[in-house]
UniProtKB/Swiss-Prot annotation:
This is ATP synthase epsilon chain. GO terms for cellular component: plasma membrane; proton-transporting ATP synthase complex. Produces ATP from ADP in the presence of a proton gradient across the membrane. The gene is atpC. It is found in: Cell membrane. SUPFAM superfamilies: Epsilon subunit of F1F0-ATP synthase C-terminal domain (SSF46604), Epsilon subunit of F1F0-ATP synthase N-terminal domain (SSF51344). It comes from the Bacteria. Pfam families: ATP-synt_DE, ATP-synt_DE_N.
Length: 134
């Protein structure tokens, strides 16, 4: 049986996860990073994307909206704006958010905060991508 480590995922409105896990895979700014027990210490930014979490025999997927990960000797902490399990995602709301972001990106550049619209589009696309695996 694989060694476990404590994984905490915290958002502004809740503790999304606080459990002993075997593995976590997150998307960092330099690519996907697999975290196991005794991983080297690190702090790095996260990209908007899916993450995988091995809890016992179950491999779970969740979305995270960027943030930071800190891997310590005792635990790993992810601080993110949002984290959701597939069953928590309101598909129609995510589709509407995606459509709004795409429409904003089509407007004149001077009228739109392009950076914010691109982030909104990435978040919506990420959420919808995870629901397709349900």
């Amino acid at each position: 049986m694989a060694s476990k480590f404590r994984l905490q995922i915290v958002t502004p409105d809740r503790t999304f996860l606080d459990e002993e896990v075997e593995m976590a895979v997150v998307r960092t700014v330099s690519g996907d990073e697999g975290i196991l027990s005794d991983h080297m210490l690190m702090v790095t930014p996260l990209k908007i994307g899916k993450m995988k979490i091995q809890i016992g025999d179950e491999l779970k997927e969740a979305t995270i909206a960027g943030g930071f990960i800190q891997v310590d000797q005792d635990k790993t902490i992810i601080i993110t704006d949002a984290a959701e399990w597939p069953e928590e995602i309101d598909v129609s709301r995510a589709e509407e958010a995606k459509q709004r972001a795409e429409e904003r990106l089509q407007k004149e550049r001077e009228e739109v905060d392009t950076f914010r619209a691109e982030i909104a589009l990435k978040k919506a696309t990420n959420r919808l991508g995870l629901t397709k695996n349900k």
